[in-house]
From Swiss-Prot:
<dbReference type="GO" id="GO:0030089">
    <property type="term" value="C:phycobilisome"/>
</dbReference>
<keyword id="KW-0602">Photosynthesis</keyword>
<feature type="binding site" description="covalent">
    <location>
        <position position="82"/>
    </location>
    <ligand>
        <name>(2R,3E)-phycoerythrobilin 1</name>
    </ligand>
</feature>
<keyword id="KW-0813">Transport</keyword>
<dbReference type="InterPro" id="IPR038719">
    <property type="entry name" value="Phycobilisome_asu/bsu_sf"/>
</dbReference>
<dbReference type="GO" id="GO:0015979">
    <property type="term" value="P:photosynthesis"/>
</dbReference>
<keyword id="KW-0249">Electron transport</keyword>
<keyword id="KW-0042">Antenna complex</keyword>
<keyword id="KW-0472">Membrane</keyword>
<dbReference type="InterPro" id="IPR012128">
    <property type="entry name" value="Phycobilisome_asu/bsu"/>
</dbReference>
<feature type="binding site" description="covalent">
    <location>
        <position position="139"/>
    </location>
    <ligand>
        <name>(2R,3E)-phycoerythrobilin 2</name>
    </ligand>
</feature>
<dbReference type="GO" id="GO:0031676">
    <property type="term" value="C:plasma membrane-derived thylakoid membrane"/>
</dbReference>
<comment type="subunit">
    <text>Heterodimer of an alpha and a beta chain.</text>
</comment>
<dbReference type="Pfam" id="PF00502">
    <property type="entry name" value="Phycobilisome"/>
</dbReference>
<keyword id="KW-0089">Bile pigment</keyword>
<keyword id="KW-0605">Phycobilisome</keyword>
<protein>
    <recommendedName>
        <fullName>C-phycoerythrin class 1 subunit alpha</fullName>
    </recommendedName>
</protein>
Amino acid sequence: MKSVVTTVVTAADAAGRFLSQNDLEAVQGNIQRAAARLEAAEKLAAGLDKVTREAGDACFNKYSYLKQPGEAGDSQVKVDKCYRDLGHYLRLINYCLVVGGTGPLDEWGIAGAREVYRSLSLPTGPYVEALTYTRDRACAPRDMSPQALNEFKSYLDYVINALS
């Protein structure tokens, strides 16, 4: 994956020129976004267990029928697997924040996820609800800076849209 820095420098070199003010502003913007992503990744990692638990609890509160016999969360083992899956998605979002792209989610979280859930008769709606709760609950400056929160929410939206 080419970075903005590599792209800008390569274009300037190909044109045989120094970096322009616009080039430098693009690089600076990229560095600022990277700093925001790293802040979001750090905050998410520090609170992963709490975020996962709150998201899962919100999901099971909204979809309480899931704990009824024959449903996706009818045993503690199945409930624990739901929390595990939520933690997995949040961990992949953490990786995306660090690398600055959706590659980890695309490769390890989304590709085939809907088909797997469908084949196991697991609804994706509760996962969407849990991740939506996380997105809507997060707030700046309580949780992280506004720019970091924007980066975090963009990856939450990406997963929500993929599972919807």
